[in-house]
Amino acid sequence: MKHLDLTRGTTVITGGANGMGAEIARQLAARGTALALIDHDTAALDRITEELRGARVSTHVVDLRDDDAVFAAVSDITETHQRINALITCAGSSMLGDIDQLTMEEMRWLTDVNLWGTVSVTKALLPALRAAPAAHITHLASVYALAAPAGRIPYAVSKFAVRAFSEALRHELDGTSVSVGAVYPAGVRTGIILHGRYAAAIDPKVAARAAAAQAAMYHTEPADAAARIIRATERRAARTMVGREARLIDVLTRVAPSSYWRVMRRPLREAIDTTTPIS
């Protein structure tokens, strides 16, 4: 499959004002790629717009849980940008808590953001992507779409579902001008864990301790991860591991699909402890 030239069209990035999405936007803007950035954070969009002054960037404030708002934003994007040849879905959040600590409302909230927000923007943008001579969709899944740890049920559920959506859509679009792939990051220092949510039933200090323990395990720099995600998009890759931990866990889950947790549990012990009080 011929590589995609991202400078010959517009790349739409969800979660484009923060974390991984913002880093991808910086690197693409430096290459001269036109961008449409979607985020719910108005202030962060203002900051990234100022940072990328001189680049071809449009920004769109959208809550991805609102389907009508998503489709309206995509309509604005297609009116502003003549050719859209890439979508990179980075928007998402995390949720810490055991099944007994989490409410149904908390779990549904994360699924709405991580899964249905991804589905909604992909569906809305698909006609514009089909109109391009060649286009690619990159969905950010997670290493937790390969291995499901304790204490991260809603996050793992949402990311496994993103993986399934991405694979099924890739098969539906096989033979068309639009290719689809998923990337599986692990250990990227974006702050998603430190700024993520936790069950209301958890002591905030305990949640902060668990989040800090998880963040301490992260070693991949956002700039390196962003460069790999951009390469995967250009190459129209179907499946890309991002970070050393992702590659290791990918192998582990293949070799020991029913017992990988025995290996993962020890290093994650403090990161999933949401019950031990702080003395």
Could you tell me what each predicted segment is?
Residues T122, S158:
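Active-site helix of classical SDR
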Residues T42-A43, V61-A72, M104:
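The beta1-alpha1 cofactor-binding region of Rossmann-like NAD(H)/NADP(H)-dependent oxidoreductases
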Residues T33-R47:
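Conserved glycine-rich Rossmann-like NAD(P)H-binding loop of the short-chain dehydrogenase/reductase
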Residues S142:
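Residue(s) in the substrate-gating loop at a strand-loop-helix junction
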Residues D98-I99, T103-W109:
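Substrate-binding pocket helix/loop in short-chain dehydrogenase/reductase
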Residues G175-R244:
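SDR active-site lid
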Residues K2-L35:
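Canonical Rossmann dinucleotide-binding motif of NAD(H)/NADP(H)-dependent dehydrogenases/reductases
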